[in-house]
Curated annotation (Swiss-Prot):
GO terms for cellular component: plasma membrane. Part of the ABC transporter complex LolCDE involved in the translocation of mature outer membrane-directed lipoproteins, from the inner membrane to the periplasmic chaperone, LolA. Responsible for the formation of the LolA-lipoprotein complex in an ATP-dependent manner. Its main location: membrane. Residues 6-224 form the ABC transporter domain. It is a peripheral membrane protein. It is found in: Cell inner membrane. Keywords: ATP-binding, Cell inner membrane, Cell membrane, Membrane, Nucleotide-binding, Translocase, Transport. This is Lipoprotein-releasing system ATP-binding protein LolD. GO terms for biological process: lipoprotein localization to outer membrane; protein localization to outer membrane. The complex is composed of two ATP-binding proteins (LolD) and two transmembrane proteins (LolC and LolE). InterPro entries: AAA+_ATPase, ABC_transporter-like_ATP-bd, ABC_transporter-like_CS, ABC_transpr_LolD-like, MacB-like_ATP-bd, P-loop_NTPase. Its EC number is 7.6.2.-.
Length: 224
């Protein structure tokens, strides 16, 4: 078996609020294999976003092991963490966070330029991804000229642009109506599978979770 893309061992995180400490993650263990698509379920406030932030190396304050593509992130400096994130991870959020002044294709090209990809190669890759998501005729549209589902598709293309081994998605279809959410998730999963990326997708939707390879649940700070 190949090495996991993500390995968590005894991941812990507490927050202090008004003098009270809450232990949100109380020893989370998880391994995700290359290409595996995992649904992360759990009630509101159970710590799904906190867990994704840990794996995404976006926040500090965690204890335990966070290993990305075989590298122990806790041993890295800030710059090296940024490089590890950029080289291996892609992100999709509930709200797309697209750059409002750039059109669809530029939103997918820019992260590739940041990663050092040649512009012509980046443009071809962006056009291919957006076309696979049905947006071939929307390449020059700015986010404000796109529907909510189309905006989220651009965000999916952006997350995959640098060929991440792992996509982290936090309620990626949570702000869409049910029919659109189903369609966007379907396309997202198809594209992720086609690319061979792994994914960890936090969702409240049990029905959509059943379309993934494995379901894990956060309950009282641990995965079950
Ligand atoms: N920066 C913070 N400071 C204090 N408390 C926090 C912070 N971030 C998260 N929390 C608390 O940690 C708990 C878990 O939050 P988190 O957002 O991870 O849950 P979630 O499962 O993603 O919820 P939802 O499904 O509603 O998005 C909540 O009680 C929240 O209030």
């Amino acid at each position: 078996m190949s090495d996991p893309v993500v390995r968590l061992r005894e991941l812990r995180r507490s927050f202090s609020q008004g003098g009270v400490t809450i232990d949100v993650l109380r020893g989370v263990n998880l391994e995700i294999r290359p290409g595996e698509i995992v649904a992360l379920l759990g009630p509101s406030g159970s710590g799904k976003s906190t867990m994704l932030q840990a794996i995404g190396l976006l926040e500090g304050g965690f204890s335990g092991l966070i290993e990305i593509a075989g590298t122990d992130a806790s041993k890295l400096s800030g710059d090296d963490r940024t490089a590890l994130r950029r080289d291996h991870l892609g992100f999709v959020y509930q709200f797309h966070h697209l750059l409002p002044d750039f059109n669809a294709i530029e939103n997918v090209v820019l992260p590739q330029l940041v990663a050092g990809t040649d512009r012509a190669v980046a443009e071809a890759r962006a056009a291919e991804l957006l076309s696979a998501l049905g947006l071939a005729k929307r390449l020059d549209h700015r986010p404000s000229q796109l529907s909510g589902g189309e905006q989220q598709r651009v965000a999916v293309a952006r997350a995959l642009a640098n060929r991440p081994e792992m996509v982290l998605a936090d309620e990626p279809t949570g702000n869409l109506d049910e029919a659109t959410a189903d369609r966007v998730l379907e396309e997202f999963l198809k594209l992720v599978r086609g690319e061979g990326s792994a994914a960890l997708i936090a969702t409240h939707n049990e029905r959509l979770a059943l379309r993934m390879d494995r379901v894990v649940r956060l309950h009282e700070g641990v995965l079950e």
